[in-house]
Amino acid sequence: MIINMSKIGRNDKCHCGSGFKYKKCCLIKDDRRDMLKKRIKNISRKDFISGPYKKCPKCDENTFGVFLHTSGNRYRRECTNCWHAQSYKFPPLKKKIIYLDQFVISNINKTLDPDSSSHKKALEEPFWLEVYKKIDTLSKQNLIVCPDSSFHTDESLLCGDPSYESLKEVYEHLSHGCTFYDHNTITRFQLQQHLANYMAGDPTKHLDLNAEHVIHGHPHEWTGKMRIGVSMRPYEGQLESIHKERKSHYEGLKSVFERWQKEKERDFMDWVKEEAYAFGEGTIKSHIAHLKKRAELPHKYAEQYLTGKEPEINLEDLFPPPSSQIIESMTIEMHRHNLRGESALKKMAEYLRSKYIIDIPIIHISSLLYGALARKAAHGQKSYPNMGTVTDVNAISSLLPYSDAIFIDNPMAALLNERPLKKEIARYNTKIFSLNTKEEFLKYLDEIQTTATPEHLAIVEDSYGDTKPSFNLLKNKKQSKEDDRYTI
């Protein structure tokens, strides 16, 4: 049904069928829609040119602005008067990579969002506003980058207040299009590299922990003036899957914690080695279980069809688990060495059960952390680790080696500061901060600021202009979201 909107009076019934008067229902929405349509219709090239403006070398008008760029090693100026254009090259960059734990993102969000129920409480801690100011400014000056991760996504989805969309806006704003690969992918990448060294007869060779190999995006490129994001809702069953996995991990940790409490005579390194070597056995058992389940599926589905039942298809049964992906990547390495069939399987089993498996950074760090938890349990700790402990261990073990600094919660930072963890973790040259060392973190950020040369800052000023922190980040997001509702 097509309605002539011009014939609807303010006091007429609304065209949407709600039964309310037009002025009380869709009038504002329709006016905003018309305004946005006109704005879109009138978009021109000038809309993609912004300040800082300076005098054009051709027409002498102060209309020589910066053309919109997303990222890369060049930027372009164009004159909105005579359309003269010039291209400029950015110098190479080496930014500091800083990983911020989810609770940092959450507190920054509460500080910036006046509508948050925790806004006033967050402002009682001046640190959150101060740290955001420094991080946002350094990010805009292309001195640091704070990649987001799947841990941020999952934790944000589970959070009710602040909302997922609001948290996502904060961590994507600070990440500038850089996202760490997920925990399982990083595990597989490290194992592939370590296995190659093992097969080459050099299992103790240090891995190349280049952050660019485990980050989507380009952490050491100049960031763009425009950030492109995708607004995605959780897929069906995603929240349930995250809850189920967290609960399973927590129950497993509680069970092993109770065992640790009884192991009062064990040495710290016994627990560390136990955790490390459990990775290989766990990978093998998980892969075998997947193969058995896959082999049973045709019979299961056929039986359901023949008995007139609708097949219960579980996607988790169809897609290979992380353990099977690891075995598949190991098989490829075996083929490079002309090993196939039984000989390849024996070699893979030999490797996964070898003493060298503990040298893989992600296994090394996680084993140390679980060893530290076991030691606390054996020495009398009564309370269980919290629900997020496994997530914290996974995040730290996978992302710490690729970060120049990480800001994590106090309990995890305290574990990493214990002996011998502190000495072992030192090999990764990563600075570790928490709320207990928040002043040191602010000082660290100030030190990064002092490394910026006058030439670097001049380029930033010429290509980006204002680098002041975006205090209206969430207000602008809400307005943009409101506009999106009325866009056709």
What are these regions (language model features)?
Residues 46-48, 53-59, 79-82, 109, ...:
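Acidic, PIN/NYN-like endoribonuclease modules and their adjacent C-terminal/linker elements
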Residues 2-9, 43-52, 67-74, 90:
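Short, flexible, mixed-charge glycine/proline-rich loop motifs
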Residues 1-41:
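Acidic/negatively charged segments and metal-coordination signatures
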Residues 38-46, 52, 65, 94-96, ...:
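Extended charged low-complexity segments that act as oligomerization/scaffolding linkers
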Residues 57, 76, 81-123, 276-317, ...:
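Metal-dependent nucleic-acid phosphoesterase active-site entry motif
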Residues 21-28, 71-85:
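Cysteine-rich micro-motifs
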Residues 177-334:
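Non-catalytic, alpha-helical, charged scaffold/linker segments
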